[in-house]
């Protein structure tokens, strides 16, 4: 069963989000490049993954600005605006602090969120991620 999709306003942009589960901690899954909160349930393995996360937490998922059901953006917004969208969704669901799960490309933004908002960050989880999206001095990959 697909959870209800709701919207939170971040500046002039509507951010689509869903909440499922009722565990003792809030867990916000920050999406990678491609997201769609309703279509993600159509992929059986990803739906099982989300269900497992929701079995021990109150899982909060959202579509990034410019993707899925969130308002479209003419270009990829700066990481700081994306970080504000996470705050907007946390505020909309009444979460004072959450474990932040950065999936793939969302890893750097999850790190920035945790560093900028330690009072709202209970823990940080990175999966399939990286510290920098491109080669730079001090990060030669």
Question: Predicted segment positions?
Answer:
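Short beta-strand immediately N-terminal to the catalytic nucleophile in serine-hydrolase-like folds
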Residues: 100-102, 127
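Flexible "cap/lid" loop of the alpha/beta hydrolase fold
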Residues: 111, 115-116, 120-141
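Conserved HGGG/HGGXW glycine-rich cap/lid loop of the alpha/beta-hydrolase fold
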Residues: 7-69
